[in-house]
């Protein structure tokens, strides 16, 4: 239908209350409205979501939004529904019945925006239903995940090309907050853009001051920073173990804190995230599992205790500070050992191919998979247990699993959504005839039957916290009751487990038959080495404005100094000190020569400490014909 400025502004005003678009929002919206494949590069807080939500309401059909961020899906669907927008989501953890119902609503035209996780789009059910859905356009959020050259490549994103073939007339809108030139080109190639079409918003964050602090005592520096800057904060660390240690350290120093990592139970993660978001807790200590899709605009400081593996990762995580446009800080703590640790990560991320083949062979022994079999089989796989049994380093095993996944031998899902599930094993009539249940057990059973449908037919995901609230019991009591009912075969209770899943995507081969191509190993290793070098250069730089250095990495060369990073402020201090020294040198030279006699430069050197300032002052006085220099002597010019 093309772009109608009046219509699109009316939707923006009536639904979101904004009077006009900002930045490159209008350009992106016009492009997608005209049916063009479009790549939008917008920094964190740049208003990405409106670039697909507004045209989704204006165009006929359903806008499909592919994103890996389940928390973001749920949050945006809830916000859109509050605005009377027909929105829905499909993600891992939903029952087949729920997915079918959601897709049927799309077929019937009862949905305008459908959020889908990349893992779901490859399913037969989704693709079958998609054929009957009128699609307006397809949005790919976090589009850098589709690029083999991106810092956060996700194999599941490669399924997106399947939708392109099923819906060839639906334009693609790809959005990302971090992309180098290689990644920009690769995104458009992977998504089969009909024509190159990129809109770039400057990644400059004028309210964000970038700081690197070199310190031998990072924990002491951390406390100093948090005591100096008020407001909400995120502290990023590299390991799950460190999240707890740093959190306890902050609590011992009277700083409100909690911690977050992928290994925590979903209910625990949700509760800690809520407390931090609602300012019940000030500091979130986390691994990089935290932050994507978290919409908290008033974070005043993001602190990295350990260096990320790339500028892209650092820029995205640091960018979570100051999304409200007010002054905020991004601080990287660096010490003498960090460079060696970063370089060591290269060998950890890319173990030699012989080691990778050994890990593959030992996995087969561990899971008891014979050569020539295993295709399609899925197993719970705990890296720590496996590593201990076969004498491997866990970090090497994790890297080998990623490389074997890229090479096509396995799929490895490190954080599957294995939430708590329940299914009744007794028929409904048998359930009503039970006589050996306690009042609390009857209360839990009644609540399950009232709040969840289809429990006699299939497993259903449940929330222990919700049942506890509905029954007036504690979560621990609900857990023990469900365990007891399961042991007595009244129902089947599967507690939440955050155990990674390993799937054989082809039959097991012998180690000598494994082929790991250059594109999977050598080329990616070279890219990783470049990213490591870039983050080291950033941390060790003390001459170039940090904002300029970051923007230059993303291809923005025509930028100015920020005048607020530690490098700029140091230069300003140095500049003022030099200016003072120069003025003092002028006064000293004039005072020395006031007697009208010749004086030696050696004599002058003894009383002017800053030699650079002295030389510049002498040059100025000579050019102004105030003094004259002959050999080693200076005197006033008559």
Q: What are the residue ranges of the model-derived segments?
A:
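Helicase motor core with emphasis on the C-terminal RecA-like subdomain
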Residues: 2-15, 19-23, 27-49, 56-61, ...
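General beta-strand recognition
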Residues: 209, 635-636
């Amino acid at each position: 239908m093309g772009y109608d400025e009046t219509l699109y502004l009316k939707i923006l005003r009536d639904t979101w209350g904004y009077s006009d678009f900002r930045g490159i929002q209008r350009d992106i919206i016009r492009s997608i409205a005209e049916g063009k494949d479009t790549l939008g590069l917008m920094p964190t807080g740049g208003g990405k979501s409106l670039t697909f939500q507004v045209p989704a309401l204006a165009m006929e059909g359903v806008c499909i939004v592919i994103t890996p961020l389940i928390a973001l899906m749920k949050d945006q669907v809830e916000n859109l529904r509050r605005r009377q927008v027909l929105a829905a989501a499909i993600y891992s953890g939903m029952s087949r019945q729920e997915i079918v119902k959601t897709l049927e609503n799309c077929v019937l035209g009862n949905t305008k925006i459908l959020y889908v996780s990349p893992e779901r789009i490859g399913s037969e059910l989704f693709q079958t239903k998609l054929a009957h859905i009128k699609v307006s356009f397809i949005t790919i959020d976090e589009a850098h995940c589709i690029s083999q050259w991106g810092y956060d490549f996700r194999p599941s994103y490669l399924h997106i090309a399947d939708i392109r073939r099923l819906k060839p007339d639906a334009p693609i809108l790809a959005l990302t907050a971090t992309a180098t030139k290689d990644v920009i080109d690769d995104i458009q190639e992977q998504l089969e853009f009909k024509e190159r079409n990129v809109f770039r918003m400057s990644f400059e964050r004028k309210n964000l001051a970038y700081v690197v602090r070199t310190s031998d005592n990072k924990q002491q520096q951390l406390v100093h920073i948090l005591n100096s800057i008020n407001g909400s904060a995120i502290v990023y660390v590299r390991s799950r173990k460190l999240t707890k240690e740093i959190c306890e350290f902050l609590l011992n120093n009277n700083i409100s804190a909690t911690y977050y990592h992928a290994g925590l139970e979903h209910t625990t993660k949700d509760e800690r995230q809520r407390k931090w978001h609602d300012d019940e807790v000030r500091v979130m200590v986390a691994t990089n599992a935290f932050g994507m899709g978290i919409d908290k605009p008033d974070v005043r400081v993001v602190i990295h205790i350990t260096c990320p593996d790339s500028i892209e990762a650092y820029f995205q995580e640091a960018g979570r500070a100051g999304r409200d446009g007010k002054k905020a800080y991004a601080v990287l703590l660096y010490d003498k050992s960090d460079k060696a640790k970063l370089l060591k990560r290269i060998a950890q991320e890319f173990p030699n191919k012989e080691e990778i083949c050994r890990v593959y062979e030992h996995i087969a022994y561990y899971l008891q998979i014979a050569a020539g079999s295993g295709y399609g089989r899925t197993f719970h796989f705990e890296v720590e247990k496996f590593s201990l049994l076969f004498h491997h380093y866990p970090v090497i095993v994790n890297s080998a699993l990623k490389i074997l996944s890229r090479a096509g031998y396995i799929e490895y899902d490190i954080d599957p959504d294995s939430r708590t599930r329940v299914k009744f094993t007794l028929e409904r009539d048998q359930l009503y005839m039970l006589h050996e249940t306690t009042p609390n057990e009857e209360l839990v059973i009644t609540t399950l039957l009232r709040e969840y449908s289809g429990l006699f037919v299939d497993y259903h995901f449940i929330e222990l916290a919700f049942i506890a609230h509905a029954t007036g019991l504690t979560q621990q009591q609900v857990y023990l009751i469900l365990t007891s009912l399961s042991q007595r075969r009244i129902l089947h209770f599967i507690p939440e487990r955050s155990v990674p899943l390993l799937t054989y995507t082809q039959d097991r081969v012998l180690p000598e038959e494994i082929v790991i191509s250059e594109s999977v190993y050598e080329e990616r290793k070279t890219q990783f080495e470049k990213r490591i070098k870039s983050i080291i250069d950033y941390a060790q730089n003390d001459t170039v404005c940090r904002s300029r250095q970051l923007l230059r990495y993303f291809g923005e060369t025509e930028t100015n100094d920020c005048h607020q990073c530690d490098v700029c402020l140091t230069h300003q201090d140095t500049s003022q000190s030099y200016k003072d020294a120069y003025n003092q040198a002028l006064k000293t030279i004039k005072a020395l020569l006031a007697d009208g006699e010749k004086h030696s430069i050696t004599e002058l050197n003894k009383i002017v400490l800053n030699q650079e300032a002295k030389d510049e002052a002498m040059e100025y006085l000579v050019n102004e014909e105030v003094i004259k220099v002959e050999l080693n002597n200076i005197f006033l010019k008559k």
